[in-house]
Amino acid sequence: LTFDGGTVANATGEILDTLKATGVRATMFLTGQFIHRYPELVRRMVREGHEIGNHTFSHPRLTTFAVNRRQDTLPGVTKEFVQRELRRMSRLFEEVAGTPIGAYWRAPYGEHNREIRQWAAEIGYLHVGWTRDLSAREDLDTRDWVADPHSPIYYRAEEVRERILNFGKGKVAQANGGIVLLHLGTQRRQDRVHRELEAIVDGLRMQGYDLVPVSELHRSLALGQGGKGSAVAAER
């Protein structure tokens, strides 16, 4: 399970309570803005054993995807810009948490390409996305960030739960190696996805899955023990 934290943290306390109650350690991809606004929540994440990944400092757009559905690097997005965003977040995290950040990052809005990933890799970061099965047209993006119930990509909380629990059914790897994308804040006034988190955890465990931080998944993939569809292996 992975959670992105941009600027809103109104679901974070409940999420951390649920993860603690169920004994799950997750990976949190945080921006520098999130760390600046919510230092106590960040320290709690670290104290309770969660892994922190880099989500840049200011959550900028990096590619043209929002304009033309292509992942072309935006004008002005340079190696220096990307590395500065990652380093600023890393420095602030270490100041607040008293420990270095891990080696994983996630691009804002899922906007990245080989060039951008290489720039990040040059300063020690491996990109982590979320699981997509293009052949089946399904993925593990919960869409919990979609607040408008009339949107064609809106899913009710119970629909999100069922999409996760049924992901990969009938396939050899099933959801093994899968990475789920959730968020630490929401604009939904009701039907909040994180309220289904305990049921999601219980359902996945009943199917025999272990829920681990990204670093443990990455190690298992390196040893040949993970699923083929992992977004860690696919986006080096």
Where are these regions (language model features)?
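Alpha-helical scaffold elements lining the catalytic groove of polysaccharide deacetylases
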Residues: 11, 60-96, 111-176, 191-194
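C-terminal domain-boundary segment and adjacent tail
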Residues: 22, 36, 188-236
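Structured helix-beta-strand junction loops
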Residues: 22, 48, 123, 175-176, ...
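Active-site beta->alpha N-cap acidic-glycine motif
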Residues: 1-70, 74-77, 85-103
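Short amphipathic alpha-helical segments and helix-helix/interface helices
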Residues: 16, 42-43, 117-120, 198-201
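Short low-complexity, flexible loop/linker segments enriched in glycine and/or proline
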Residues: 41-45, 67-70, 142-146, 225-231
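Acidic-and-aromatic substrate-binding clefts and catalytic sites of carbohydrate-active enzymes
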Residues: 6-10, 29-39, 63, 105-114, ...
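Structural recognition of the beta-strand scaffold that forms the well-ordered cores
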Residues: 1-2, 26-30, 51-54, 101-107, ...
